[in-house]
Amino acid sequence: MLRTHDLGSLRSEHIGQTVTLAGWVGRRRDHGGVAFVDLRDASGVAQIVVREEEVFHGLRNEYVLQVTGTVSKRPEGNENPALGTGEIEVIAEDVTVLNTSDPLPFQIDEHVEVGEEARLKHRYLDLRRPGPSRNIRLRSEANRVARDLLHHEGYVEIETPTLTRSTPEGARDFLVPARLAPGSWYALPQSPQLFKQLLQVGGFEKYYQIARCYRDEDFRADRQPEFTQLDIEASFVDQDDVIRLGENIVKAVWKLIDVEIPTPIQRITYADAMARYGSDKPDLRFGQELTELTEFFKDTNFGVFKAPYVGAVVMPGGASQARRALDAWQEWAKQRGAKGLAYVLYKEDGELAGPVAKNLTDTERAGLADAVGAKPGDCIFFAAGEKTPSRALLGAARVEIGHRTGLIDPTDWAFCWVVDAPMFEPAAAAVASGDVAVGAGQWTAVHHAFTSPKPEFLDTFDKDPESALSYAYDIVCNGNEIGGGSIRIHQRDVQERVFELMGLDKEDAQTKFGFLLEGFKYGAPPHGGIAFGWDRVVSLLAGVESIRDVIAFPKSGGGFDPLTAAPAPITAQQRKEAGVDFKPEAVKPVEARKAEAVK
């Protein structure tokens, strides 16, 4: 046994006991003839008193020590109430250096700012710091709480494959060459979606796992190519059942940070969320809802406002902004693909000013403030054009206004469910936003191709896809989507109709999803589920800005790993063995390969 006690466990009741401890050297203080060492392990820090000068002078930061000594009360006035061990110290009798340390690339101190590149390159050192260590331990606790709750509810934890076939699910797959089948490839799963549905067919009525998922996406802010979901699926449930379970999980994990989340959590339709907040993940910690002005400006002479949609959002106190600040808003809008952000300043004296105001009629000027709920001293921002991008711009401006004006209390928690989302969107729009359309049709799924339509659209979704609403539900916290799910399609003919609408004919559907369609032939039960983005959930609990801060070994921008320098080239021998460059004359059908395997 290298130690008898954890450092952080020592208290006044241990005074007089001989203990053996192990840990890393933190701060060292030489007081002439006696030295004090802060020794640290995973449980905390304890002060070690070293009286042998020769021993002390040989120690350096982050040396690994084993110390045997006697627990003593600190001299009066030297207690440290900030430490759990602050009432005691250990008088060292024997000090053994278990390992030395080279000079550090940065200090193991949470009060010292360290660049992210250095932190990720030496992540094993970064994890010794209190903040990163605390985040990873919080993640472990969140895992435990979720598992305990789900086991109590009768859910079974089941691992699904991480080597599967490539199936279009809305993003690009990471592909893995199959050495024993040259020219064939596995794919890493974007989610356990198809397997968890087949588990329902298999009679596992309540399934969950903490699943690793992989998506080869273009770089987006705060995304990781590999990420974690708390993945859940159940048979014989409706939307209310799944939402109720999701709320119980949220309540349980938020209790880890002593926050009580009231339930039921409010529900907002997708249409309302977009109209009122310009986002399908609205931040409800503050108001400042959007106002549609299309009808208000229907007879306008101002060319900019002769548009399919005109909307506005109010910035309280914004009329006092300097010209430089107003110009900066234009640059802000251009970075989001807009031409600019029109505005009217509602002066304290009641006058309207700014470049837009002079283009308005007297009637429009007289009614504008009341129409948008502006007060003297406010600034009114406008967007005009196609409805979707205009609302998105105003929604982003709303959040920016909330931050700039202090309307958002960072200690608040505001949750909502967004329900009744469209089932389909134009495939071109999905591709433009960075997603991958599943088929070659004009329409693709908003959530995924396995989401059921709401019952009232079951007979018409493929005839009028633009109007069809899905049986989907997303949970949002402070403007972050932290989970999403749906009631699934469980009837083969309905699933085939969805595939056909999305441009997958029967042959394509059979090739890509035949195993799922086959399963649906044998009494698939009605089922539904939800998946929480676990990295995002834990980052919110930890109060950090990036999900990288709650992942033990995250990737940096573009999916690069500074620690291992992955991805990296492979050798010529590896390429040959893996069959990366293999060019088959013709890929044999699945049935032929199965027949050969049987032989």
UniProtKB/Swiss-Prot annotation:
Cited function: Aspartyl-tRNA synthetase with relaxed tRNA specificity since it is able to aspartylate not only its cognate tRNA(Asp) but also tRNA(Asn). Reaction proceeds in two steps: L-aspartate is first activated by ATP to form Asp-AMP and then transferred to the acceptor end of tRNA(Asp/Asn).
The protein's Enzyme Commission number: 6.1.1.23
Lineage: Bacteria, Bacillati, Actinomycetota, Actinomycetes, Micrococcales
Reaction equation(s) it catalyzes: tRNA(Asx) + L-aspartate + ATP = L-aspartyl-tRNA(Asx) + AMP + diphosphate
HAMAP family in the cross-refs: Asp_tRNA_synth_type1 (MF_00044)
UniProt key word GTP-binding: no
Signal peptide: none
Gene3D superfamilies membership: Bira Bifunctional Protein, Domain 2, GAD-like domain, Nucleic acid-binding proteins
Protein name: Aspartate--tRNA(Asp/Asn) ligase
Organism: Pseudarthrobacter chlorophenolicus (strain ATCC 700700 / DSM 12829 / CIP 107037 / JCM 12360 / KCTC 9906 / NCIMB 13794 / A6) (Arthrobacter chlorophenolicus)
Record localization: Cytoplasm
Family the UniProt entry places it in: Belongs to the class-II aminoacyl-tRNA synthetase family. Type 1 subfamily.
